[in-house]
Amino acid sequence: MAQAKTFTAEEFDALLDFVSKRSYAMRNRMMILISFWSGMRVGEIASLRIEDVVDAAGKVKREIRLDAAQTKGRHARTVFFPAKLAAELQIYVDARAVKDRKQPFFMTAGGKAFTANVMTQHFFWLYRKAGFETSSHSGRRNFLTQLSAKGIGIRVLASLAGHRNIQVTMRYIDASDDMKRNAVELI
């Protein structure tokens, strides 16, 4: 199976621009940002409830705890949100003004929770319609590749990804020509 595409900054901006002009723009933007800026799996994103992401005062948490049932490996883990993601999510949370903290964080057009499969298909079609041939895993792969390019160690990356084996994490990381050029300049 081919690896999911990693996006250039320009491609990522084009994707967000495309999404901004379509139905459910805010929801779709937030789904993409969580994928690209936290490295969460699509199934984990689909499983999120308001209470997972938002504290009792209505503020987006910077660290969220996924229980074992929410993760692929069935091991609870903490996901860290960068400040820029928390700020974007706060706008979404405030716009939704949800009172029921048990409600899904992302809902389909029909008002139901996304399943992992439906969200995977949703990402696939968002990408396809925006002109990108890739899968729902692109955001996660992009997240790990970008952090690797910035010098973050493989053990930290594995922990952020929820991988117990660094060999798995290494398969996610793309080594672009720009990364190689920058690497040799460090000599």
Where are these regions (language model features)?
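DNA breakage-rejoining catalytic core of tyrosine-based enzymes
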Residues: 1-13, 73-82, 99-102
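A short, glycine-centered helix-capping/turn motif at helix boundaries
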Residues: 35-47, 150-152, 163
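C-terminal catalytic core of Y-nucleophile DNA break-rejoin enzymes
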Residues: 70-90, 103-124
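Conserved tyrosine-mediated DNA breakage-rejoining catalytic core shared by Y-recombinases
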Residues: 47-76, 80, 85
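N-terminal core-binding DNA-recognition domain of tyrosine site-specific recombinases/integrases
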Residues: 4, 23-26, 76, 113-117, ...
